[in-house]
Amino acid sequence: MVVRVELDAIDMKILRELQDDGRITNVELAERVGISAPPCLRRVRKLEEAGVIRGYRALLNASALGYDLVAFCMVGLKHQSDANLKAFAARTASWPLVREAWMVSGESDFLLQCVAENLASFQDFVIEELTATENVDTVRTMLTIRQVKDACQVEI
């Protein structure tokens, strides 16, 4: 479990700026939040060490790279012991098509977001990998029509 970190107004400004532009220089960041560069860098490092900032990455356009299909899979397991849940969660890490995997409550045990080149490659994954996985009982899929919101930022 993640421990909540006490953040002051400057920390919040730093986080807002970094969410908007993760490639900003420390000097520019310090200027925008109203402090000098050395304490700004110390604050950023502290936020990284505390796990508030998990990393920095480029947001890629999947369609531009040939991945035209986004689908969700709702997966139910036959047995939900802690070991079985952990085993399936670990298995999801080995599937390149799975972009995100969530353990959920309700009718399914896991929700997977998948990105594939096309319907055929997604079907191959579902049939040859997902449903063939030990302890998988049910798989329901939903193909997306269009994305209407893509907010990767946390509201702060």
UniProtKB/Swiss-Prot annotation:
One of its GO terms (biological process) is response to amino acid. One of its GO terms (cellular component) is cytosol. GO terms for molecular function: sequence-specific DNA binding. Keywords: Activator, DNA-binding, Transcription, Transcription regulation. It comes from the Bacteria. Residues 26-45 bind DNA. Residues 7-68 form the HTH asnC-type domain. Pfam families: AsnC_trans_reg, HTH_24. Homodimer. Mediates a global response to leucine. Exogenous leucine affects the expression of a number of different operons; lrp mediates this effect for at least some of these operons. This is Leucine-responsive regulatory protein. It comes from Rhizobium meliloti (strain 1021).
